[in-house]
C-alpha cells in the first residue's frame, strides 16, 4: 500500500490499477474486515526531531519543527471547504470512528489545521465526505453512546452540556469501573470531543455530510445530508452562490494551512 503515500496526481498507471483493485476489494468486504485490515497496516513514521531540556524551550523547538513539516502556504480563504474524513484518529485505535469522532475530526482537527486564519470564510460551508454510520464500540466508547443518543437530541449547546451533564457522566460508577478496569475512555471524554469542535461550529455556517448512509446521524449532529459529493456541492452553491470559491483539503497527509 506504499503507493497511497503519494499524491494521486503523481500516480503511475500501475498505481492507479492497484488503487482501483484495492477499492473494488474493499467494497466487497464487511466493514469490520475493512477496518481490521487497514488498522493492521503499520504507518511509515520516522523521527523528524529530538530535543531535550526545559519544557518551554523544547516546546518552542518542536512547534517550529512541526510547522516546518506541516505548514502549506495558502493565499485566500474559500467559501466552500471539502474534506474527506479518514478512518483514523487518536481515539479509535483498533476501534470504530463513531459519529462523535467523525465530528471531532471534521470540526476539531481538520477545521483547526490552520495558522493565522481558517481556510474557510466565516459563515462558509464545510462539506465532509463520510458514511456517518451509526456504530459505536461498547468496550472503548460506552459513554459516547449515551451522550449521542440521549444528550444531543436535547441540546447541542456546549455550555449547557457542560453545566448540566458533564459531572454526571464523570461520576457515573459504571463508566468509572470500565475506565479503571476495562479499556473504556473516561465517562466525560465525549464532552471534550464535543468541546473540541466548538470553534468550528461557531465559525461554519453549514455542514453537509456527503455520502452519509443515513439521515439521523447528520441530523443529530446538526448537519445536512447529501447522497454524494456532486449533490453536496450543488447544495453549498445554493447557499454561497455560483461563484463561490471551493477548496479541497486533502487529509491525510497532514497539512496545516498557513494562511496569508
Task: Outline where the language-model segments fall.
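Non-catalytic terminal/interface segments that mediate subunit docking, oligomerization
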Residues: 81-83, 90, 103-104
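Structural motif
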Residues: 79-84, 127, 247-248
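A short, acidic, amphipathic alpha-helical segment used as a generic capping/interface helix at domain edges
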Residues: 56-74, 107-116, 182-201, 227-239
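Conserved, well-structured core segments that form the ligand-binding/active-site neighborhood
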Residues: 1-77, 84-87, 108-112, 118-120
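Short, basic, glycine/proline-bearing loop/turn elements
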Residues: 54-55, 92-103, 217-221
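C-terminal catalytic subdomain
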Residues: 95, 102-206
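Extended hydrophobic packing segments that form well-structured cores
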Residues: 194-260
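Flexible loop/turn segments at secondary-structure boundaries
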Residues: 88-92, 134-138, 215-218, 254-257
Amino acid at each position: 500500500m506504499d503507493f497511497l503515500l503519494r499524491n494521486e496526481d503523481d500516480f503511475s498507471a500501475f498505481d492507479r490499477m492497484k488503487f482501483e483493485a484495492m477499492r473494488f476489494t474493499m467494497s466487497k468486504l464487511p466493514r469490520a474486515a475493512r477496518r481490521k485490515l487497514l488498522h493492521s497496516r503499520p504507518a511509515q513514521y520516522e523521527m523528524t526531531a529530538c530535543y531535550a531540556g526545559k519544557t518551554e524551550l523544547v516546546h518552542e523547538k518542536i512547534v517550529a519543527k512541526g510547522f516546518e513539516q506541516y505548514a502549506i502556504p495558502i493565499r485566500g480563504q474559500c467559501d466552500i471547504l471539502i474534506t474527506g474524513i479518514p478512518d483514523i484518529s487518536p481515539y479509535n485505535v483498533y476501534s470504530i470512528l463513531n459519529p462523535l469522532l467523525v465530528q471531532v475530526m471534521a470540526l476539531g482537527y481538520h477545521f483547526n489545521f490552520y495558522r493565522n486564519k481558517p481556510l474557510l470564510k466565516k459563515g462558509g460551508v464545510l462539506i465532509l465526505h463520510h458514511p456517518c454510520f451509526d456504530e459505536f464500540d461498547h468496550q472503548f466508547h460506552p459513554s459516547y453512546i449515551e451522550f449521542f443518543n440521549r444528550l444531543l437530541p436535547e441540546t447541542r449547546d456546549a455550555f449547557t452540556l457542560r453545566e448540566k451533564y458533564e459531572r454526571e457522566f464523570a461520576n457515573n460508577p459504571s463508566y468509572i469501573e470500565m475506565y479503571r478496569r476495562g479499556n473504556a475512555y473516561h465517562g466525560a471524554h465525549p464532552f471534550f470531543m464535543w468541546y473540541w469542535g466548538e470553534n468550528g461550529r461557531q465559525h461554519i455556517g453549514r455542514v453537509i455530510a456527503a455520502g452519509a448512509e443515513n439521515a439521523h446521524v447528520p441530523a443529530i449532529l446538526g448537519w445536512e445530508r447529501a447522497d454524494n459529493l456532486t449533490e453536496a456541492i450543488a447544495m453549498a452553491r445554493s447557499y454561497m452562490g455560483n461563484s463561490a470559491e471551493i477548496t479541497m483539503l486533502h487529509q491525510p497527509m497532514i497539512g496545516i494551512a498557513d494562511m496569508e
